[in-house]
């Protein structure tokens, strides 16, 4: 079966080369027919799992389409070449070709297809090169935002934010989450704004920037419904505990369902949050009662010392 498909692919390549030849009666190459044959060759090689040959056929198809000024079809062929590289586990090279395809989609006036290609590239590279994935997700978000497709844009920004948090790139994460929050506010998804405020505060506290964390909460009071919400109350309690270096109070808030059931990356931030100086334990109820006894004992000892030599 594989050998048959390989032979089929080679036949299509030979036909494509014929279409590209010029002669006395044929002055111009037939790029359209050549591209079609290269495409068929790529499919045959792919079915035979000969991904290197399939990739080469896709690239030749792309060039033929470019020569024919068919940018959309050229972009599709470059994207397919990228997918063949993915099958060969050559992910950085795959992403490079898919990025090229997305730029051509934009030139061709098909931004939606460009955005989908960029998102696909981000998913491919996410586990290998998170930094590149962040860049791709942000590019995708920009394309969607330019098209006023804000819900899709904010979804991609969310992916970028989580990767930044995972990589402990907190300064960039704080900016990314703020951008998410602004869009959610614009589309009037206020409950999600509350969650983004929690994420912001956790990121700022991991940056050891209490002032920025407090400012986030203060600014969120203007969001309809935030003041008086459980999110607001929890954040006020968290900031109070952090400010007073009360690790118990901070841990109690961060272990609450409100924090634990956030996106995993933010839940981990909460669970790993340590107050400055390592924190102190809350005083147990018995402690205040013990103090007077201790003070009285010390006073009694001092009195004994004063008269330890006896009376004259």
Swiss-Prot record:
Sites of Phosphoserine modification: 284, 308
Q: Which GO terms describe its cellular component?
A: Golgi apparatus; membrane; mitochondrion; myelin sheath; synapse
Membrane topology, as annotated, equals: Peripheral membrane protein
Q: Where in the cell is it found?
A: Membrane; Golgi apparatus
Any one GO biological process: intracellular protein transport
Q: Which InterPro entries match?
A: NSF_attach, TPR-like_helical_dom_sf
- Record PTM Phosphothreonine, positions in chain: 287
Task: Give one Pfam hit by family name.
Answer: SNAP
> Which top-rank group of organisms is this from?
Eukaryota
Acidic residues bias: where? 300-312
Q: Where is this region: Disordered?
A: 281-312
Sections of the chain in a coiled coil: none
* CDD domains found in the cross-reference section: SNAP (cd15832)
Keyword list (alphabetical) reads: ER-Golgi transport, Golgi apparatus, Membrane, Phosphoprotein, Protein transport, Transport
Q: In which tissues is it expressed?
A: Abundantly expressed in the heart, liver and kidneys with lower expression in the brain, spleen, lung, muscle and testes.
Q: According to its UniProt entry, what is the function of this protein?
A: Required for vesicular transport between the endoplasmic reticulum and the Golgi apparatus.
The record describes its quaternary structure and partners as:
Interacts with RAB11FIP5. Interacts with VTI1A.
Q: Which family does it belong to?
A: Belongs to the SNAP family.
Query: What is this protein identified as?
Result: Gamma-soluble NSF attachment protein
Q: Which organism is it from?
A: Mus musculus
């Amino acid at each position: 079966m594989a050998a048959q498909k390989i032979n089929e692919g080679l036949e299509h390549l030979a036909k494509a080369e014929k279409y590209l030849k010029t002669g006395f009666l044929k002055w111009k190459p037939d790029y359209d027919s050549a591209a079609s044959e290269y495409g068929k060759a790529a499919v045959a090689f792919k079915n035979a799992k000969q991904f290197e040959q399939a990739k080469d056929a896709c690239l030749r198809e792309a060039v033929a389409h470019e020569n024919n000024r068919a940018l959309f079809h050229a972009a599709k062929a470059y994207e397919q070449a990228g997918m063949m590289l993915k099958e060969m586990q050559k992910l950085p090279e795959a992403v490079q070709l898919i990025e090229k395809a997305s730029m051509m989609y934009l030139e061709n006036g098909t931004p939606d297809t460009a955005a989908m290609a960029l998102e696909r590239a981000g998913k491919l590279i996410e586990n290998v090169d998170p930094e590149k994935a962040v860049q791709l997700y942000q590019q995708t978000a920009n394309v969607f935002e330019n098209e006023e497709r804000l819900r899709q844009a904010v979804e991609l920004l969310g992916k970028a934010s989580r990767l930044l948090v995972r990589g402990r790139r907190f300064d960039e994460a704080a900016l990314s989450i703020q951008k998410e929050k602004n869009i959610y506010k614009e589309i009037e998804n206020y409950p999600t704004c509350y969650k983004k405020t929690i994420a912001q505060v956790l990121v700022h506290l991991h940056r050891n920037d209490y002032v920025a964390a407090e400012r986030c909460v203060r600014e969120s009071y203007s969001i309809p419904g935030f003041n008086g919400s459980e999110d607001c109350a929890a954040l006020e309690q968290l900031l109070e505990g952090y400010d007073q270096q009360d690790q118990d109070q901070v841990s109690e808030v961060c272990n609450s369902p409100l924090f634990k059931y956030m996106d995993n990356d933010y839940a981990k931030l909460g669970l790993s949050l340590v107050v400055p100086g390592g924190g102190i334990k809350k005083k147990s109820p018995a402690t205040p009662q013990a103090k007077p006894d201790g003070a009285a004992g010390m006073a009694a000892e001092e009195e004994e010392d004063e008269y330890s030599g006896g009376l004259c």
